[in-house]
């Protein structure tokens, strides 16, 4: 590489051979060299000075007479218009390759705005408003806020397209928290209207969205901090105390009691609506849907009841000892018993239930079962979890790890969560049988457990309910000390069963009570409490 002094000498020599008017506009040596490079490669090109101090080099060819130029230009355009698009592109590429750097920059400045067209504004001009609305409807809330600030036309498309309403509707369709909140807060009445005139304007939904976000953040904070409104149903069994099982929906709570009865409660008033009798032993497990209630008892029978009338529709006599747990779904029912067996039933209707297969393999009472289309999962006092094929009822694998008998589990997708009399909770990958995490904190047998996408909630014989961070528990890097979010202590006896959703936990206990832990409707006074868990009591005795 030549030293700068040599380059400068050559440049000065070249500049001296060129009239001064050709390089006067070049403000420095580098620009001079660029201009002279153009001159050397294109002898017919002249470099002209730019005024106003921009120090830019303009290179242009010597223009022929005006008349010839216009004729030649028109002729060139005429031929250009007759060519195909590919030929036009090829011609322009050749043309650009013969130009200098300054000309390239000038063309780039001309093309840049043409390549940055505002298609959202252009589409409505072509009568394609619906396409512009559809494009913007995929934005999340933050992006939609930014889009409103682009220009008035974008704001108009968002407003007339009711895109804030559509965003809220999309969240309600895909997120159970949003769906439940829309029903409980009442703003579901403004959604999914067929005609835009049936509801409020876009501004209503624009202001509603941040209120929903604030509501959700408050609910999550209530879960983390243990703030809740507590309602208590005192069951007051006459013969013996204990609520062994329960299930609820928006309207009712159905519970199975140690006194052999099934009680149905109104969820709003907490009044006992109906008492079902027929079992001759404690009601240990139940499940219901929109048609039937199925119960299992220590009398070793399974009974099927009409959920509306309370009439007994069917009684299944198969197990030799207490029926400890059952699940049914999509025409299949699985029951398990103290007799160490699992029964798989085809459930065509409430009155047409036939035994398909008996699964044998556990060496102690089978305390709990769960299943989906792929696997049946069972847990036993023999310390093992066994996995069976749902379609063939064949044994698949055993999950080993608990040190004592297993009292409860839930299975969904690949995840199994189990609770044991060794006082621990274990998370398992059902496909490979690996134990993913051990949760410690309960002081006695873990009797009941449920999980969703965010949380695990467990109840134990120590009378405590613990809320765990599921996502953190699945992260091997998360410290054990961060996994338990909150411990709830209100029951005075063993916690037998619980169920929860995004807004509440409902639990039952040996203390003969059902507790409703409401994390949505927390009084403002409790919201301001930060040092300790807050609660408000509603006591119902029946």
UniProtKB/Swiss-Prot annotation:
SUPFAM superfamilies: F-box domain (SSF81383), WD40 repeat-like (SSF50978). WD repeats lie at residues 238-275, 278-315, 318-355, 361-398, 401-440, 442-478, 490-527. The N-terminal D domain mediates homodimerization. Gene3D superfamilies: 1.20.1280.50, 6.10.250.1840, YVTN repeat-like/Quinoprotein amine dehydrogenase. It comes from the Eukaryota. Substrate recognition component of a SCF (SKP1-CUL1-F-box protein) E3 ubiquitin-protein ligase complex which mediates the ubiquitination and subsequent proteasomal degradation of target proteins. Probably recognizes and binds to phosphorylated target proteins: the interaction with substrates requires the phosphorylation of the two serine residues in the substrates' destruction motif D-S-G-X(2,3,4)-S. SCF(FBXW11) mediates the ubiquitination of phosphorylated CTNNB1 and participates in Wnt signaling regulation. GO terms for cellular component: cytoplasm; cytosol; nucleus; SCF ubiquitin ligase complex. It comes from Mus musculus. Keywords: Biological rhythms, Cell cycle, Cytoplasm, Nucleus, Repeat, Ubl conjugation pathway, WD repeat, Wnt signaling pathway. Self-associates. Component of the SCF(FBXW11) complex formed of CUL1, SKP1, RBX1 and a FBXW11 dimer. Interacts with BST2 and USP47. Interacts with TRIM21. Interacts with PER3. Interacts with INAVA. Interacts with REST. Pfam families: Beta-TrCP_D, F-box-like, WD40. This is F-box/WD repeat-containing protein 11. Induction: Expression is negatively regulated by Wnt/beta-catenin pathway. Residues 121-167 form the F-box domain. Residues 67-116 are annotated as: Homodimerization domain D. Its main location: cytoplasm. GO terms for molecular function: protein dimerization activity; ubiquitin-like ligase-substrate adaptor activity; ubiquitin-protein transferase activity. Pathway: Protein modification; protein ubiquitination. It is found in: Cytoplasm; Nucleus. InterPro entries: Beta-TrCP_D, F-box-like_dom_sf, F-box_dom, G-protein_beta_WD-40_rep, WD-F-box_domain-protein, WD40/YVTN_repeat-like_dom_sf, WD40_repeat_CS, WD40_repeat_dom_sf. GO terms for biological process: negative regulation of non-canonical NF-kappaB signal transduction; positive regulation of circadian rhythm; positive regulation of DNA-templated transcription; positive regulation of proteolysis; proteasome-mediated ubiquitin-dependent protein catabolic process; protein dephosphorylation; protein destabilization; protein polyubiquitination.
